[in-house]
Amino acid sequence: RNKVKQVKFPFHLRVPKWCKQAEIRVNGKMEQTVKGGKIAIVDRIWKRNDKIELYLPMEVFTSTWYENAVSIERGPLVYALKMEENWEKKEFKDSWYGSYYYQVTSSDPWNYGLADFDRNRMNEVAQVSINSQKQQLDFPWNQENAPVEIKMKARLIPTWTVYNEMAGPQPFSFCGSAEGGEQEITL
């Protein structure tokens, strides 16, 4: 058994860039705050049973992709429109990639544009709900068990259509092309 009661060393923690400002606590007391994208160093004398906690507050934000497509993100996750999933097993003739794969399709509408889109107000317009019971599940990586949902207002864009069995090019402008009133969508 090791007789050393305490030891001094630096403890390095990487704070991801998506986190605006993290908090580090040692034994329940605030040690320091660190901006995202930085390495925090807690250099101290450590004793047996010391406890270090890293808090990474998650905010809703957006990122822009090809053809000005916008994705909704919160913390390290990118959210997708919640849709009914139809899973179909497909066989490969050539086993180079495996013997089969699953094709996932949906008959639900997918071509929505965000109705109240303002990058600077995402935490106001996006309603985040966290199901604490689902947070305890062993496998949260599917729609049924996902513990976090984001609800937003959107409008259907009928001019944005399927092309080659996938989402076609986005219309240059959605002005005047939205159909019907605002709907609440779930991501």
Residue ranges with predicted function:
Residues 46-48:
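Surface-exposed, short loops/turns at beta-strand junctions within beta-sandwich domains
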Residues 19-44, 62-67:
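Solvent-exposed beta-strand/loop surfaces of large extracellular or lumenal domains
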Residues 6-26:
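Beta-strand-rich binding/interaction modules
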Residues 11, 40, 70:
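A broad, low-specificity signal marking well-ordered, structured residues that form hydrophobic/aromatic
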Residues 1-2, 35, 55-187:
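C-terminal beta-rich recognition modules with glycine/proline-rich loops and embedded aromatic residues
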